[in-house]
From Swiss-Prot:
PROSITE patterns according to UniProt: G_PROTEIN_RECEP_F1_1, G_PROTEIN_RECEP_F1_2
Gene: P2ry13
Positions in the Cytoplasmic compartment: 54-60, 122-144, 215-237, 303-336
Protein name stated in the entry: P2Y purinoceptor 13
Subcellular location, principal: membrane
Localization terms from the record: Cell membrane
Similarity comment: Belongs to the G-protein coupled receptor 1 family.
Positions annotated with a glycan in the UniProt record: 6, 14, 266
Short name of one Pfam family: 7tm_1
GO cellular component: endoplasmic reticulum; plasma membrane
Ranges annotated as spanning the membrane: 33-53, 61-81, 101-121, 145-165, 194-214, 238-258, 282-302
Gene Ontology MF annotations: G protein-coupled purinergic nucleotide receptor activity
Lineage: Eukaryota, Metazoa, Chordata, Craniata, Vertebrata
Source species: Rattus norvegicus
Length: 336
C-alpha cells in the first residue's frame, strides 16, 4: 500500500516537470473576474452581515441562513490570495500558502455552504408539507447542533490537506499536487470523492424537497382557484433557488473527478490535463459566484431579512398589504 502511494507521489511530481501548465487564461482573465466577484461579494455579504446581526436566531431557518453567510464571508476573504497568486503579482511563497491553506479553507467553506443550502431546503420542506407537526428537527437546538457538526466535519476532513505537504519550493508550488506528500495525494483523492458524494446527495434531496413543495403550492392554488401574478411569482421562487444551486455548483462537480484523477496519476495526456485544468478553473469561478447569489436567496426566502434592508423596507410594507389573502402554505415559502 505504502509503496503504491510513494509511486503515485513520484508520478505526480515527475508529471509536473514534464507537463508545464498553460496559465495564460488563469493569469490574465480570471484574476480580473475574481476581483469583480470579490468586491461584489464583500459589498453584498457585508450588508447581509449587518442585517443578520439585527435578526435574532430564534428559528432553524435563520440559523441555517446565518451559517451560510459565515461560509460565504470566509470564501470571500480567501479570494485575494487566489487573485494575487494566479496573476503572479506575489512571490512564489504566497502560492505555497494558497496550496496549503487558503484554497483548502475555500473548499471547506464552499461545502459547508452547500450543506447549509440543503438544510434550508429541508427546513422549507418541513414548514410546507408538515407545518403543524412538532418534531425535534424544527427546534433551534437541532439546527445549532447540526450546523456545528457540519463545520467540525469539514474541518476534520480538510485538516490533513493542510498538513500532508512537502516543503514548498519555487518549483513545487507551480502545481499544488506537486507540493503534496504521497499520503497527501491519496487523502486529496479521498476528499474529492467525499465532496462529490456530499454535493450530489444534497442536490438529489433538494430536487425531491422542491418537487414536493411545488406540488403542495400548486394544489393549494388550484384548491382556492387563485392564479394571480403574485401566486405565480411565489411558485417561481421555489425553482429560482434550485436553479442557482445547480448552475453554480453542478458544472464544477462534473469536472472535478476527472481533474483530480489527472493530478494523482501519471496516465493523463499533457494536453488533456491542461484542458481539464482550464475546465476546472472555469467551473470553479462559476461556483465562486455563489457568494454573490446567496444574498439574493436571503431576499427571496426571508421577509425578516428584507424588512431590515433600508432600500427594501418601503417595498416590503407595500407588498404586505396585498399578501393577507395568501394561504399559510404559500407564506411558508418566504417566511421564517
Amino acid at each position: 500500500m505504502l509503496g503504491t502511494v510513494n509511486t503515485t507521489g513520484m508520478q505526480g511530481f515527475n508529471k509536473s516537470e514534464r507537463c508545464p501548465r498553460d496559465t495564460r487564461m488563469t493569469q490574465l482573465l480570471f484574476p480580473v473576474l475574481y476581483t469583480v466577484v470579490f468586491f461584489t461579494g464583500v459589498l453584498l455579504n457585508t450588508l447581509a452581515l449587518w442585517v443578520f446581526i439585527h435578526i435574532p436566531s430564534n428559528s432553524t431557518f435563520i440559523i441555517y441562513l446565518k451559517n451560510t453567510l459565515v461560509a460565504d464571508l470566509i470564501m470571500t476573504l480567501m479570494l485575494p490570495f487566489k487573485i494575487l497568486s494566479d496573476s503572479r503579482l506575489a512571490p512564489w511563497q504566497l502560492r505555497g500558502f494558497v496550496c496549503t491553506f487558503s484554497s483548502v479553507v475555500f473548499y471547506e467553506t464552499m461545502y459547508v455552504g452547500i450543506m447549509m443550502l440543503g438544510l434550508i431546503a429541508f427546513d422549507r420542506f418541513l414548514k410546507i408539507v408538515v407545518p403543524f407537526r412538532k418534531t425535534f428537527v424544527k427546534k433551534t437546538a437541532f439546527a445549532k447542533i447540526v450546523s456545528i457538526s457540519i463545520w467540525l466535519l469539514m474541518f476534520l476532513i480538510s485538516l490533513p490537506n493542510m498538513i500532508l505537504n512537502k516543503e514548498a519550493t519555487a518549483s513545487t508550488v507551480k502545481k499544488c499536487a506537486s507540493l503534496k506528500s504521497p499520503l497527501g495525494l491519496l487523502w486529496h483523492q479521498v476528499v474529492s470523492h467525499t465532496c462529490q458524494f456530499i454535493f450530489w446527495t444534497v442536490f438529489i434531496l433538494m430536487l425531491l424537497f422542491y418537487t414536493v413543495i411545488a406540488k403542495k403550492v400548486y394544489d393549494s392554488y388550484r384548491k382556492f382557484k387563485s392564479r394571480d401574478s403574485k401566486h405565480k411569482r411565489l411558485e417561481a421562487k421555489v425553482f429560482i433557488v434550485m436553479a442557482v444551486f445547480f448552475v453554480c455548483f453542478a458544472p464544477f462537480h462534473f469536472v472535478r473527478v476527472p481533474y483530480t484523477h489527472s493530478q494523482t496519476t501519471n496516465k493523463t495526456d499533457c494536453r488533456l490535463e491542461n484542458q481539464l485544468f482550464l475546465a476546472k478553473e472555469s467551473t470553479l469561478f462559476l461556483a465562486t459566484t455563489n457568494i454573490c447569489m446567496d444574498p439574493l436567496i436571503y431576499i427571496i426566502l426571508c421577509k425578516k431579512f428584507t424588512r431590515k434592508v433600508p432600500c427594501m423596507r418601503w417595498r416590503t410594507k407595500t407588498a404586505a398589504s396585498s399578501d393577507e389573502h395568501h394561504s399559510s402554505q404559500t407564506d411558508n415559502i418566504t417566511l421564517s
